[in-house]
Amino acid sequence: RSRQRLLSAEGETQARTVGQVFQRHRLGVDEVLASPFARCHDFAQIAFGRVQDDRQLLGLLSQDSGRQQRIDHSLALLRRAVVAERNRVVVGHSSNIQQTTGVFLPEGGAVLVRPDTKAERGFSVLGELRPADWAALAQAA
């Protein structure tokens, strides 16, 4: 932890806002998975009150021997069905998101996907949320 970039005060505020959006809109959450990096783990913990660290969600910036395995794991998560009326939350790194979905997000953003066996990749991208979108959703009734 001491050598990692920690979640900033702005990141903590964003995490609380994300949690408020899920509560206010009664969005059910099944799993909360996160990269074990401190900022990812802490974001998930603050937003959802629980988190399961998943080493396979480490970033993809290096060309190490486990890179393809991490890509495959992320793709499997996106393809795997969730419990009805529930969501799987994955807090990770932009490199993973870009590699698996083709979407580039700023920190604090989200890509919404749905498993879809008819889609070429086995999932469909439904949309994106930018950091400012979370604040607007938190205010909406």
Residue ranges and their predicted role:
Residues 57-67, 71-79:
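All-alpha RGS (Regulator of G-protein Signaling) helical domain and cognate RGS-like helical scaffolds
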Residues 18-21, 74-78, 98:
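A generic local structural motif
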Residues 1-55, 60-64, 103-132, 137-141:
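Active-site-proximal alpha-helix that buttresses catalytic centers in soluble enzyme cores
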